């Protein structure tokens, strides 16, 4: 699938990064003289974040190609993401230029935060394929995207967005600013009043959000949070208790403070005092790191945004476990990013196990033990592991894992992995014993014939002697005798 991106700013750069990291080539057009630098910096942040977000092996990144015109960028593209400034006349001109060259079947998705599809489609030749796909920053991490416009194009776009790890929400009726920005604007408007009236500073408002209801919203949203607030009686009790307050009201509603230089200076000054010690890039990295921690917590509970991470990891595992004729198998590669390095300057201990575990997952998928197989109630559990650390691995290294089958029977599987660096040197080995289990009954069971046939096929390729360290335990170092 060929992707085209028109506009490479903060949002456009995030789109570009997400598609490239998911393995797609992207052709970009942006006449801004700093576009290449901006996208390169966003890509660096995104690559670092994905390396920490996903525990599965990542695909080989796609390539970025810079076009000298819109026509060159969209030629042959299947999906076109427009992320130019929020001016309707500009978007009309860009969409017209896209349609002049793009395939009639190509989806044209606008990142607009405010305009409706009906407005974007004015003057369009193939208006049915012009839709809204409005993301949230950082696009390479936050999965939700508001898809507005309906029809076949919206569904096709949603399928594509799911494949790159996003959570498309198709909005059935168009409205100015869609859903997310309408909610954000209400909070923003009220916050401006609180600052202008001297009731709270920017830091106090941010603290109340990030130490309070923001944490609830990140995992429960608005209505589910209030459902819990209603106690055992649920949402009806909450509405009965707090509904009358809507008639008071507490908020400024549609009143907006006069947006003048005085208000701008007040807010900008407080913001500088609050966060001026950090550069924007530093704040972005802090934000990304915190988001990754939240994603991991949600994934552990199979909840909310964590489900999108889990689903994407399953896609990566399935892609990685491709059929391979050569033996020993080379089913997994890894790139050591900066987040994998410890205080000694080399890859930290548990990352070796992660690489070995990813290689085991790739082998299991290779023989047919994939996500569908696990969902049906069977899996393989590792019950014993022996790792040997043979050489240091630095940040930036690219690793390949060679996998051999050392033994098997109807319930057990014994594997050997060798982690190789780019020079072919073995930097670590892992030997693992796995049991085939019925996850519903929580007991060991025999593997089905299809898995046994796949293992028989690997066994037929196993010709060399076992590694001389196979089956050995950790080297003995005895305690010194002490006098009584």
Swiss-Prot record:
One of its GO terms (molecular function) is hydrolase activity. It comes from Agrobacterium fabrum (strain C58 / ATCC 33970). Coiled coil: none annotated. NCBIfam families: PRK07531.1. This is L-carnitine dehydrogenase/betainyl-CoA thioesterase. Residues 323-484 are annotated as: Betainyl-CoA thioesterase. Keywords: Cytoplasm, Hydrolase, Multifunctional enzyme, NAD, Oxidoreductase, Plasmid. Residues 1-322 are annotated as: L-carnitine dehydrogenase. The keyword NAD applies. Its main location: cytoplasm. It comes from the Bacteria. Multifunctional enzyme that catalyzes the NAD(+)-dependent oxidation of L-carnitine to 3-dehydrocarnitine and the cleavage of betainyl-CoA (N,N,N-trimethylglycyl-CoA) into glycine betaine and coenzyme A. GO terms for cellular component: cytoplasm. SUPFAM superfamilies: 6-phosphogluconate dehydrogenase C-terminal domain-like, NAD(P)-binding Rossmann-fold domains, Thioesterase/thiol ester dehydrase-isomerase. Its EC number is 1.1.1.108, 3.1.2.33. It catalyses: carnitine + NAD(+) = 3-dehydrocarnitine + NADH + H(+); N,N,N-trimethylglycyl-CoA + H2O = glycine betaine + CoA + H(+). NAD(+) binds at residues 7-12. In the N-terminal section; belongs to the 3-hydroxyacyl-CoA dehydrogenase family. L-carnitine dehydrogenase subfamily. In the C-terminal section; belongs to the betainyl-CoA thioesterase family. Homodimer. It is found in: Cytoplasm. GO terms for biological process: carnitine metabolic process; catabolic process; fatty acid metabolic process. Gene3D superfamilies: Hotdog Thioesterase (3.10.129.10), N-(1-d-carboxylethyl)-l-norvaline Dehydrogenase, domain 2 (1.10.1040.10), NAD(P)-binding Rossmann-like Domain (3.40.50.720).
């Amino acid at each position: 699938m060929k992707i085209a991106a028109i506009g490479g700013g903060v949002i456009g750069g995030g789109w570009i990064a997400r598609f490239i990291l998911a393995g797609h080539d992207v052709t970009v057009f942006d006449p801004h003289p700093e576009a290449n630098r901006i996208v390169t910096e966003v890509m660096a942040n995104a690559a670092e974040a994905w390396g920490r977000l996903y525990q599965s092996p990542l695909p080989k990144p796609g390539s970025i190609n810079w076009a000298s015109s819109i026509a060159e960028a969209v030629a042959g593209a299947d999906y076109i993401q427009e992320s130019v400034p929020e001016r309707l006349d500009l978007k009309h001109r860009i969409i017209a230029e896209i349609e002049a060259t793009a395939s009639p079947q190509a989806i044209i998705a606008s990142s607009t935060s405010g305009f409706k599809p009906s407005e974007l489609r004015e003057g369009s030749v193939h208006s049915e394929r012009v839709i809204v796909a409005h993301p949230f920053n950082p696009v390479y991490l936050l999965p939700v995207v508001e898809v507005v416009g309906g029809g076949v194009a919206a569904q096709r776009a949603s399928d594509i967005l799911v494949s790159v790890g996003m959570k498309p929400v198709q909005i059935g009726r168009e409205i100015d600013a869609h859903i997310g920005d309408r909610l954000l604007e209400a909070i923003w408007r009220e916050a401006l009043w609180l600052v202008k009236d001297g009731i709270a500073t920017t830091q106090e408002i941010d603290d109340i959000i990030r130490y309070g209801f923001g944490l609830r919203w990140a995992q429960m949203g608005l209505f589910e949070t209030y459902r819990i607030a209603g106690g055992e009686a649920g949402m009806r009790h909450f509405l009965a208790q707090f509904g009358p307050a809507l008639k008071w009201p507490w908020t400024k509603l549609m009143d907006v403070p006069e947006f003048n230089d005085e208000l701008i200076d007040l807010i900008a000054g407080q913001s500088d005092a609050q966060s001026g010690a950090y550069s924007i890039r530093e704040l972005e990295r802090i934000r990304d790191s915190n988001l990754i921690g939240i994603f991991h917590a949600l994934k552990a509970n199979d909840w909310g945004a964590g489900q999108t991470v889990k689903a994407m990891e399953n896609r990566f595992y399935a892609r990685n476990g491709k059929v391979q004729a050569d033996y020993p198998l080379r089913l997994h590669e890894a790139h050591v990013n900066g987040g994998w390095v410890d205080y000694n300057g080399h890859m930290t201990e548990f990352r070796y196990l992660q690489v070995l575990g990813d290689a085991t997952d790739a082998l299991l998928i290779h023989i047919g033990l994939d996500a569908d197989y696990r969902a049906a109630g069977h899996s393989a559990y590792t019950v014993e592991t022996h790792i040997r650390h043979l050489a240091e691995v630095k940040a930036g290294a690219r690793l390949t894992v060679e996998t051999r089958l050392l033994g098997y029977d109807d319930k057990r599987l014994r594997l050997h992995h060798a982690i190789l660096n780019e020079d072919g040197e073995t930097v670590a080995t892992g030997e693992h014993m796995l049991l085939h289990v019925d996850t519903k009954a929580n007991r060991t069971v025999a593997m089905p014939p299809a898995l046994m046939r796949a293992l028989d096929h690997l066994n037929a390729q196993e010709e060399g002697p076992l590694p001389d360290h196979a089956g050995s335990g950790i080297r003995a170092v005895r305690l010194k005798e002490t006098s009584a």
